[in-house]
């Protein structure tokens, strides 16, 4: 079991100081504000809360599901655990801090878990159920029929989007989708449906796609090398930073642009495209041709850098000025000196400029985990197909 978490301010991720107060419930807890799927507090018999210290409280489900999930976390996070497979599995789960019960209701037991979103300013969150079967081997015929009818394509697709919450830059707000959105996705619309999670209203966040692929591939590697456990109706929780000003200490693209562009030259409404979390700008009157040209210029800058510079120094201005690509750009589409100012941004982009976004992918929901002596083929199938879809989005 992990050590107690540091105390955190109890404010919904992405909220501001002016947000209305959240009603406090048992022991000062509040409903989890950024939950995208699963049992909702106040709507279902059991639900998910947030503790004043920032951890997530998941109420145990009725037997046998609740005790089974508790047993899973207890086994994986046992202090004396020496099983290499389970120790490796910890890397892909939320940290577990034991159980918690409110003083006024000691018989209500909650799992105390890490809030995977806590380090993000504007967390974009997606819950994806993995596997070809969303029912376990001991399910009744009625339960099997119920689960199959919810999403008949589960066997073929291998995963189901249960919900998502995406931050949109232009409106400073979140777009949410529930389980009905995922159930409506077909083989033909699956790619577009998943890509919606990575679109911030201005552009497709390919940096977040790439980061997510890396995380899922590590989980796949774990599954391909273990024959101890089989998972049913379990999910992956995807999280990435939706803000242009992440909470981490890493420099961000808006900061870079602000360093080199004169005050007032660009506004938030001017964002046109972004490439690997880099924002490109133009006036609405200029049309999309400017953004495409600037995108090409930025790509050319990166290629020139990789080809001619092995050190960490940035390109000199005169190097790129000699490139005819800049001369071929349509000047009548540009306002004033924006192009030359954007050139300066490109020149000063440091090497390895945040190619991969800040992102997390964690396994959640373990009420249907069973001992096994074979590879979990259903889960592996789902992971591989999900990776294929993500790669298709990245390559589009």
UniProtKB/Swiss-Prot annotation:
Top-level EC class: transferase
Keyword Lipid metabolism in annotation: yes
Keywords tagged on the record: Acetylation, ATP-binding, Kinase, Lipid metabolism, Magnesium, Metal-binding, Nucleotide-binding, Nucleus, Phospholipid metabolism, Phosphoprotein, Transferase
GO molecular function: 1-phosphatidylinositol-4,5-bisphosphate 3-kinase activity; ATP binding; flavonoid binding; inositol tetrakisphosphate kinase activity; inositol-1,3,4,5-tetrakisphosphate 6-kinase activity; inositol-1,3,4,6-tetrakisphosphate 5-kinase activity; inositol-1,4,5,6-tetrakisphosphate 3-kinase activity; inositol-1,4,5-trisphosphate 3-kinase activity
UniProt biased composition (Low complexity): 1-13
Motif Nuclear localization signal in this chain: 300-310
Cofactor note as given: Binds two Mg(2+), but the interaction with the protein is mostly indirect.
Region (Disordered): 1-22
EC number(s) given by UniProt: 2.7.1.140, 2.7.1.151, 2.7.1.153
Binding site for substrate: 65, 129, 143-150, 179
Chain positions found as N-acetylalanine: 2
Positions contributing to ATP binding: 58, 114-116, 127, 365
Tissue-wise expression: Highly expressed in kidney, and at lower levels in hippocampus, brain cortex, cerebellum, heart and lung.
Phosphoserine, modified sites: 19
Primary site of residence: nucleus
Disulfide feature: none
UniProt cross-references to InterPro entries, sorted A to Z: IPK, IPK_sf
Listed result of changing residue 127 to A: Shows weak but significant activity toward the substrate 1D-myo-inositol 1,4,5-trisphosphate
Signal peptide: none
Annotated pathway: Phospholipid metabolism; phosphatidylinositol metabolism
Needed co-factor(s): Mg(2+)
Catalytic activity: 1D-myo-inositol 1,4,5-trisphosphate + 2 ATP = 1D-myo-inositol 1,3,4,5,6-pentakisphosphate + 2 ADP + 2 H(+); 1D-myo-inositol 1,3,4,6-tetrakisphosphate + ATP = 1D-myo-inositol 1,3,4,5,6-pentakisphosphate + ADP + H(+); 1-octadecanoyl-2-(5Z,8Z,11Z,14Z)-eicosatetraenoyl-sn-glycero-3-phospho-1D-myo-inositol 4,5-bisphosphate + ATP = 1-octadecanoyl-2-(5Z,8Z,11Z,14Z-eicosatetraenoyl)-sn-glycero-3-phospho-(1D-myo-inositol 3,4,5-triphosphate) + ADP + H(+); a 1,2-diacyl-sn-glycero-3-phospho-(1D-myo-inositol-4,5-bisphosphate) + ATP = a 1,2-diacyl-sn-glycero-3-phospho-(1D-myo-inositol-3,4,5-trisphosphate) + ADP + H(+)
Compartments it resides in: Nucleus
Family classification: Belongs to the inositol phosphokinase (IPK) family.
Chain's role: Inositol phosphate kinase with a broad substrate specificity. Phosphorylates inositol 1,4,5-trisphosphate (Ins(1,4,5)P3) first to inositol 1,3,4,5-tetrakisphosphate and then to inositol 1,3,4,5,6-pentakisphosphate (Ins(1,3,4,5,6)P5). Phosphorylates inositol 1,3,4,6-tetrakisphosphate (Ins(1,3,4,6)P4). Phosphorylates inositol 1,4,5,6-tetrakisphosphate (Ins(1,4,5,6)P4). Phosphorylates glycero-3-phospho-1D-myo-inositol 4,5-bisphosphate to glycero-3-phospho-1D-myo-inositol 3,4,5-trisphosphate.
Name of the protein in its database record: Inositol polyphosphate multikinase
């Amino acid at each position: 079991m992990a050590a107690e978490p540091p105390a955190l301010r109890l404010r919904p991720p992405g909220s501001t100081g002016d947000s209305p107060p959240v009603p406090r419930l048992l022991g000062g807890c509040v409903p989890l504000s950024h939950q995208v799927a699963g049992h909702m507090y106040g709507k279902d018999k059991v639900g998910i809360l947030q503790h004043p210290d920032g951890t997530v409280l998941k109420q145990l489900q009725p037997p046998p599901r609740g005790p089974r999930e508790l047993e899973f976390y207890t086994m994986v996070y046992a202090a004396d655990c020496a099983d290499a497979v389970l120790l490796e599995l910890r890397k892909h789960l939320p940290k577990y801090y034991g159980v918690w019960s409110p003083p006024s209701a000691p018989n209500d037991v909650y799992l105390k878990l890490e809030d995977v979103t806590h380090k993000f300013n504007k967390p974009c969150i997606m819950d994806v159920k993995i596997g070809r079967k969303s029912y376990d081997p001991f399910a009744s015929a009625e339960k099997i029929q119920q689960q199959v009818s919810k999403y008949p394509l589960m066997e073929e697709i291998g995963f189901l989007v249960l919900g998502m919450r995406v931050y949109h830059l232009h409106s400073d707000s979140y777009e949410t989708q529930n389980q009905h959105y995922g159930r409506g996705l077909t083989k033909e619309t699956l790619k577009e449906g998943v890509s919606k999670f990575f679109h911030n209203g201005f552009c497709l966040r390919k940096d977040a796609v790439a980061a997510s692929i890396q995380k899922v591939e590590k989980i796949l590697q774990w599954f391909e090398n273990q024959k101890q456990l089989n998972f049913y109706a379990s999910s992956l929780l995807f999280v990435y930073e939706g803000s242009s000003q992440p909470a981490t200490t890493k420099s961000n693209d808006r900061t870079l642009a602000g360093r080199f562009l004169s005050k007032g030259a660009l506004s938030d409404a001017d964002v046109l495209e972004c490439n690997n979390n880099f924002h490109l700008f133009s006036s609405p009157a200029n049309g999309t041709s400017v953004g495409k040209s600037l995108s090409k210029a930025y790509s050319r800058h990166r290629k020139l850098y990789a080809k001619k510079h092995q050190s960490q120094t940035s390109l000199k201005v005169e190097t790129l000025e000699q490139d005819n690509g800049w001369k071929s750009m349509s000047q009548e589409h540009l306002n004033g000196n924006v192009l030359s100012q954007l050139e300066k941004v490109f020149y000063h982009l440091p090497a390895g400029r945040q190619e991969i976004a800040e992102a997390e992918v964690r396994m959640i929901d373990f009420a249907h985990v069973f001992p096994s002596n074979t590879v979990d083929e259903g889960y592996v199938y789902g992971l591989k197909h999900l990776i294929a879809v993500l790669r298709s989005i990245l390559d589009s």
